[in-house]
């Protein structure tokens, strides 16, 4: 017969193993489910300049500070994307790239396809958006890319924490977020 303390230890170990297994299963399930986008986006209100507050590091933004994106309509109804940043320091040279974006589904600007180089395309999903279009949370459905954008170069810390919590709730690894240096 197994002693009472030993049974208790086995029961606790089994509970802990079950909790770990359930946590792992929940994490895997979240990975298989694409993130949710905002229900609706009014493109005319979204157009204009946005400043990057934070992002996941990426090879294509290596050495970037003071990063900003400007969106405008093209004659054919698509969106012109102009990304710019300074090289390494706030006084560094400006670097930029132009691309084009269009809705993945006609009329739905919450999920865009973006192309900077033919034939490569990327996904640009608006995950959260301030009702007054003051800030936006943008990500890729594979959760490897994430951006916190604002109409101003700075955002209040409590608001930033709320946005980060929204990203985490959608399954993004927010420990990878890095703040973007912007001029004061």
Language-model features and meaning:
Residues 16, 23, 28-184:
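A beta-rich soluble binding module of mature secreted/lumenal proteins
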């Amino acid at each position: 017969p197994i002693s009472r303390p030993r049974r208790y230890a086995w029961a606790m170990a089994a509970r802990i193993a079950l909790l770990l297994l359930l946590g792992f299963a929940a994490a895997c399930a979240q990975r298989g489910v694409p993130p949710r986008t905002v229900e609706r986006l009014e493109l005319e209100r979204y157009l204009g300049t946005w400043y990057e507050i934070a992002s996941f590091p990426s090879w294509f933004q290596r050495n970037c500070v003071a990063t900003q994106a400007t969106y405008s309509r093209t004659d054919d109804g698509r969106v012109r994307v102009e990304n710019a940043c300074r090289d390494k320091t706030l006084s560094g040279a400006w670097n930029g790239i132009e691309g084009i974006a269009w809705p993945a589904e006609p009329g739905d600007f919450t999920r865009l396809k973006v192309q900077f180089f033919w034939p490569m395309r990327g996904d640009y999903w608006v995950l959260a958006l301030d009702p007054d279009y003051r800030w936006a949370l943008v990500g890729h459905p594979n959760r490897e890319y994430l951006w916190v954008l604002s109409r101003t170069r700075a955002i209040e810390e409590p608001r930033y924490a709320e946005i980060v919590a929204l990203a985490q709730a959608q399954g993004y690894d927010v420990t990878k977020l890095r703040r973007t240096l912007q001029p004061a």
